[in-house]
Structure formats: C-alpha cells, structure tokens
Amino acid sequence: MKNLAVQSDVTQNINMLNKLHMAMIELYKGDSRRIQHFCKVHSYARLIAQMENVDYKTLFIIETAALTHDIGIHTCEEKYGECGGRLQEKEGPALAKELLERLGFETDISERVQYLIAHHHTYSNIDGIDYQMLVEADFLVNMYEDGVSKDAVLKAYNNIFKTEYGKYICKDLSLIHI
C-alpha cells in the first residue's frame, strides 16, 4: 500500500512540474533564448541531482527552482532597464511565490524555492545541496551561453563546483584538463 502512495505522490509531483514548466514557457512567451536557458538549467540540475542520488523531495525542490530561477528577469528589465543577478534575486521570489501558490505547490517547497531564487547569484555560504546543484547547473549553461574562456571555466570548476557529477559535466563540456 505504501508503494502505491509513493507512486501517486511521484506522479502528482511530475504533473506539477509539467504544469510549472508550461507556465514558465507561457510567462516567457516570445523570449525563446530565456525559455531555452531555463530548460537547459532544469535538465542539468535534474541530471546532477539524480546522479548524486538526492532524495525525492530535494529533487522536486531542485527541479522547481531550476525552472523558476530567473523568473524575475522580465520584471527587472521593465523596472530597472536591466536584469543583473542581484536584481533577479530581489524581484524573483515574490513572482515565484505567486506562481507556485497558484499551481498548488506546498508552502515549504515554495519557501525553499523562493530562498534559492533569492540567492542563486550568490556563491558564498551555499547552504544546501539543492542550492549547490542549482548554482552548478546555472553555471554550466551560462558558461556555454556566454562563451567564457577556458581559464574562466577552470576558475569556476575550482571555486564553484563541488558535486562529483557537476564537476564531471563541467570538465567534459569544456574539455578542461584537471
């Protein structure tokens, strides 16, 4: 009986993530570059989390945060004329709270995701595996999208990446030699 309950929870969470994914695509309608960005961050975050064998609740938080981590970008562009990381951290959490609440996400999940959004461009005092994996996934995508040098990749590898699989992917994507 317990297995059926767990399977039902997993199915419900997958459905919630799919609804969130579609809601984010709708939110970013017409901005294919940003849609591609959060889709790639989600893919890497999920891969790293699964390979690192995180528990299911942590995986759900990581996936939710990866889909919504840049939710404040358009608001920042409208309010400030730019969308730097600190501004995203400022504007994103309230937007995520509203969206996650509308989609029926539990309060504890929403609160952790809001925290991760509020800190995903802050690389000191990373206080959880979900935070670490989100930062690594975002770095993997940003390094490629921004065309950073091998020296910059190596610096990020040494200073930012902590998980075994985040490091592995970073090395293989960038062909850096450690």
Language-model features and meaning:
Residues L59-G81, G92, A96, Q114-H121, ...:
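His-Asp-centered metal-binding catalytic motifs of divalent-metal-dependent phosphohydrolases/nucleases
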Residues K2-T11, E26-C39, S43-D55, T68, ...:
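Divalent metal-dependent phosphate-bond-processing catalytic cores, especially two-metal-ion Mg2+/Mn2+ enzymes
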Residues V41, L87-R102:
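An active-site-proximal "capping" alpha-helix that borders the catalytic cofactor pocket
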Residues N18, H42-S43, P93-L95, E111:
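A generic alpha-helix surface/boundary motif
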Residues L17-K40, G72-E82:
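Active-site flanking loop/helix segments enriched in acidic
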